[in-house]
Amino acid sequence: MCIALSHSLAALNSGIMSTHQGGSVRSIRPFKSSEEYLYAMKEDLAEWLKDMYHLEIIVDNFTEILENGSVLCQHANNVTEVAREFSVQYPQLAEKLQLPKSGVKLNMMAQPGTFLARDNVSNFIQWCRKEMDIKDVLMFETEDLVLRKNEKNFVLCLLELARRASRFGMSAPMLIQMEEQIEEEIREEMDLPPPEIPVPKPQRKLCDFKNLDQMVQHLVSRCTCPVQFSMIKVSEGKYKVGESSTLIFVRILRKHVMVRVGGGWDTLEHYLDKHDPCRCTSLSHKPAIKLGSLQKQVSAVHEVKTRLTPRLDNPSKVETTLIVSRSQSPLPPVEWRSYSSGRTRTTSSSNSLDNNENSPTFKMSPSDRRSMSTSYRAHERSATPSRKLFTEDNPEPQQLGNPQSVNFRHHHSTSSLASQLTGSEEENSCLSEVFSESQSRRQMGRTTVMSLKEPAMKEAFLSHTQSAHRKVMSATEQNNIQQGSRIVNQSINSQDSRPKTPSRFIRPPSPSKQIHFFHNQQNKGVEQNPKTQINSCTRSPSPVKQTSLTYKQEFTKRPATPSRISSQYKDGDKSAATEIIPSQDHIKSKPSVSSEERTIRTGRSTPTIHLNKNGITYREVSNLPPRMQPKPDALELSHSIERDCMYTPLPIDPEQEKQIYRSLEDEILTNIKVLEGDSEENHPENDSHGFNMLEKSTLPLNASTLKNPSGQGSVPRSGVYINTTWQSGACYDDVITELTKGHVKLNRVDVENWISKIPSKGMVKEAEEAHTSQRNQVRENGHTGAVSQRTIVRKKTPSTEIKGSKPKQLPSQRARQLALENKKKTVDNVSENQASTFSGDSGETVQEKIKLSQGLKPKRTLKKPERVPSIYKLKLRPKIRPRRDNRPEKKPSRIPTPVSYRQMPSRNNGKAVKRTQSYQANKTSAPQTLNESQSSTVILEDLDSDDKTLEHSAPSQAVETPVTIGNDQSKTEEEEESWV
């Protein structure tokens, strides 16, 4: 028979279901996943193990009791004993079945999580695979139980083990017994032969079916869709479901309604969620919560993708509305009844809203999420003509209900409100007044949440708001041109007579349809100032459906920013643009009226920028009365967002532009003075590198403020302030004169020069010129000694100037001086040695040898730095000694030294002698070579890097090289080998 799904039948069965309410609610609670049937299986297995082994095991500590593996191994050994007894009693049947033959080794003292516990679990797994032949798809791993990685496979493995053990007489859980009962029913229906040998089993008492139909009916009737999932009862515990009439077997397992699916089990609720087309497409699923009264039970909310709603223009035609957003909160219950009049529809909808306010489901879910999701659903409907709402009567208290219902109603669109509201204009105005009054009372609690939501919502809806606002303003302006004077007079009279009754309008749902309200307002006797409509701020969350927000006449006026005025009225029509300023004065003239009025607000105060003759002034138009002001944190967040959206850059007058250009020119001139350094570098007393740092430091301060258009005060502009009394340090003509001089040669600047100066290149040029003249004199006269002395003096000149001009010396300059001192000492030592060795020679010969020793500069190679040797060189370097044999029968023999090491000193001595002879033979060409090397040395000394400083000390080593070679000839062969 078909199960009735009406609410009357559910009310009749409420008394019967009262005893099973706890179990039904537990089985139909919302699923996080498909693990609800695991709870029922673990509950059954826990009770089964408790009866067999007298364990204190329940569902909550199911895995904790079994994770050490000792209980599992005991169960495996028990199954093996039962199999042995069965093979003795039924030997013929035992041959057809695969029975376990060996047990499992276990450690009873294993602690959970230890390796001993893992060994127990691993032994049980091997026994299941080898002895019981359980397939891998139903097996679990050690980590699944020890670390709780996969409890599902662990539970399925225990059920499969109990299923196989029940074949040879072992007691089985309730689920296995129900499986066997269902198999017998199928065998009887299909006329299959009974099993060959009935095995006696210790049976347990199964649950009866007296409450099964009521529980199944309760679970199926939770769906509120017009076309519900069909379940037809065939026999006790057997139903046909769906259009395909699939046969299912339903059983009650303690507190769960279980369905036999294939080779396993599932809960009926989860089965319906997977197979009911309506529930498969649902976005949320909430349980039915029973209220205090037993006769009155609110049906559960079931959210679906398609929802049939009546249209305003054609009530007989239905339209499918798609739900766009996932809602974590339920919808109001749908009452499927036909409405004859609009008043009945209004009452039923308000009652349904009031019923939902009392349900715990609404209390658990945030009101803001519900309102947001409801507004998205309302926006999906196509555009329909809007209605006007006026406030002329007092609000009806029975429609007010709860602030949550008003919040739910607040986010509907115009068409959804109009579909629920029919009748006279007075009735609509009453509901609109309720709309605004309840919103003002509820605003304080929602201020913080709404202010946090505004940053995300403002960026998404800003473009739609601006475009729709322009259309309303343009349409209102055209209407104002025709009826301007007459409406102004009527609005003044109406404001004096009824100051607290504002005129309202609702934005049409489609941007293409602009519906004006002046004609109907004249019929009602309530008029509105046309200038107010220009500045009324309306917002819409989508371009299709726009939120129906009502606004007060006086309090929500916000002047347009200068950018908007120029963009809207740039076509030459300036009449509407000039009307904005009087509306601002009109706001100031009536502060008492605007402070008393209340309207629908978004929980923020909007900063507006007024550009008048006295400059720019910021003014905040607050949409809240003083007692309803939001928190300062929420206001700061909304103010910063509004300021970013509403800010318009200031115009720059020609004087400010000229000041900026002058500051740029001075900056360019200062940079040019920094880069040019020839004239300033020649004066060592100037310690600031030829330019005044004071002028550069005061330049940003002078260019830090900007005058307003009238010249009064200073206004911040992007964090830069330009002073009104700015005076430049240089003239514009000086810059032109400096630039017309031509290309300025720039010098290379080192970082160290910002602290202490280096010798200028002018000195290097003078040294080169003097060196060239001296080289010419040497070619004519041939006096090499004088040339070398002049060269040495010339090399000393830059260093002495450096000492005079710099109080501090950097590491690179100290290294350069050390190299020059070493070179000087080396030259003096060489001259003394040459004078003592060749005492019989003339002074000219001694000077020639000094020149030759300086000219013997080797090839440029890497040089070790002159520093203290490392510990490796001092202590850890072994001294190489000749290898000796310690054979007693023979004399110790020396390993000969390689020939290459013996010939190296002699080769070096021969090369030195050859070089000396060649340079003595070529006396005419030697002075020229020496001078060239010295000139290159002078040029290299002007470089500032430390790598070049290392090269200056290379000639000193070159001078020392021949002397060292000459003195080392007396070294023995053994000492040479030791230093190799």
UniProtKB/Swiss-Prot annotation:
Keywords: Cell projection, Cytoplasm, Cytoskeleton. SMART domains: CH (SM00033), GAS2 (SM00243). It comes from the Eukaryota. Residues 323-445, 474-503, 523-607, 763-980 are annotated as: Disordered. Residues 337-359 have a biased composition (Low complexity). GO terms for molecular function: actin filament binding; cytoskeletal anchor activity; microtubule binding. Residues 396-407, 414-445, 475-496, 523-553, 828-845, 903-938, 954-969 have a biased composition (Polar residues). It is found in: Cytoplasm, Cytoskeleton; Cytoplasm, Cytoskeleton, Cilium basal body. This is GAS2-like protein 2A. It comes from Xenopus laevis (African clawed frog). The gene is gas2l2.L.
